[in-house]
Amino acid sequence: MKLLNNLAIKKLISVVVLFIALFFLGYDYYQTSQPNIWGDEPDESYITISGKKPIDAYLEVWTHFWVTGDECEAYSYDLFGQKAHQGGKISQKITHDFAKDGSNFEFRIPYQTYKNSQNCIVELRDFSIQAHNDFDTVGFAQLRFSPAGREYYNREVDLNSLITADNCNSDIFKSIRKEWAGAIGCHFYVDGKKKTKDEEFNAYTIYYDFSKFNNDTVIHYDILAGENYRSEPLSSAQKTAVVSDDN
């Protein structure tokens, strides 16, 4: 009887130990499998871009970095797989939205220059943000950010300015596949001053002095729907019916 009790205790201890081991293995896997979200750690420097958006829209940010330096060990390659030149460009897509509700957005963007593990200087070149919904899956209200210059077209915009993609409305056009497709165009404003003559279906560019970026920098950008803003996509029947009628 005593032997059976000892065996039962040992079996129970083994089960408990196994459960604890599996718990920590699972926790470790969970931690390592989580996406690397920039800006969720206190030692990560970033600028913020935030504002309003249509509740059905989702946004994404693209950042592009120069990779340079005399000691840089990374190379760009040509179509034949041969080394073309030292350094190159890194592109990063950011999709994590820190906003707490669907009518706003908040993205955190790395901006500081640093030296990577290949002794290359990595420096922010430009970045952009654009919206998508089920009607316009290609993207709309795209805003690009580039370094300011001395020409009339790339003059510096104040970092505290409010940028607005206003009166964003849907339009239908014939695609290269001879089907009708949807797109959304917007009018762009900076501090209430209209910057685009017609609806912009491509992108608008803002020029900043990147050297002024710091951890407190917040870019204010609102995307506002117009009366003819559309969320629902064209159905297959609608596309073919319209094309048939046009022919």
From Swiss-Prot:
Observed phenotype of the null mutant: Deletion mutant is susceptible to killing by V52 strain in a TseL-dependent manner.
Localization per Swiss-Prot or TrEMBL: Membrane
GO cellular component terms attached to this protein's record: membrane
Topology term for the membrane: Single-pass membrane protein
Principal subcellular localization: membrane
Record field: transmembrane: 7-27
Record's keyword terms, sorted: Membrane, Transmembrane, Transmembrane helix
Function according to Swiss-Prot or TrEMBL: Immunity protein that plays a role in preventing early activation of toxin TseL.
Protein name: Immunity protein TsiV1
Species name: Vibrio cholerae serotype O1 (strain ATCC 39315 / El Tor Inaba N16961)
